[in-house]
Amino acid sequence: KDRVRGFPTLYLHQSVGQDLEDGAEANGFKFEYYGPDQDTVVAGLNGGIFADVGPVPNGEPFQKMEVVRAAFNRVKAQVRVFSFSFGYADVREDDREAVQAEYQKLVAEVEAAGVRFLHVTPPIVYSPEENPPKQAMREWMLATFADAVIFDLQDIESLDGGARCEVGGVWRICEANRSTEACPSKGQGIDGDGAGHLCEAKAAEFAKALLYSVYQVSR
């Protein structure tokens, strides 16, 4: 716990990442706010949302990576662990390979500066037809960065009681894990089938795995 609270870490994300931030806070680990053009981070966890830090909307992965690059260059002398996650709208088949190539370049830049990078697999949604590109990116991440620490969000959000939630071999976020009227996201509202926000209780559970990944990469 002391290591996670003391190791300067910056995590940039969109709304599913905000669910995880809220979940971490429920476990006693608050992310300090990181905002636009900010050039400082505090010891421990720092978090920023792309809609604010950019601002850049979902569905613009290359713009997001430029925001990530600019933020990293502002704080690279201070931060020890750096991470960002795509939103579910950022990963499409038509430009997935180009996004992956730019992501790999960005990771290399972070590591060349002596900073540790924490990978996060892209979130999936409830509607299975939208998820194959996201699964393909996950598989690429696991193969390309096999020796790195990867927070496999996609894996855990598509499991319920050890059973995989899938349709015809395509994973989906489980009904028990998604934001519904029975268990809404803390801040993102009730989801339609094309979204993938996290039930507040599940976000707190999944955030433990995120925090453990931060610990692992900081060792």
Language-model regions, residue ranges each:
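Extracytoplasmic/secreted cell-surface and envelope-processing proteins
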Residues: 19-20, 90-99, 126-132, 158-163
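Divalent cation-coordinating acidic motifs and surrounding scaffolds
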Residues: 22, 26-68, 154, 163-187
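Substrate-gating cap/lid alpha-helix
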Residues: 122-162
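Histidine-centered active-site loop/cap adjacent to the catalytic His
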Residues: 171-219
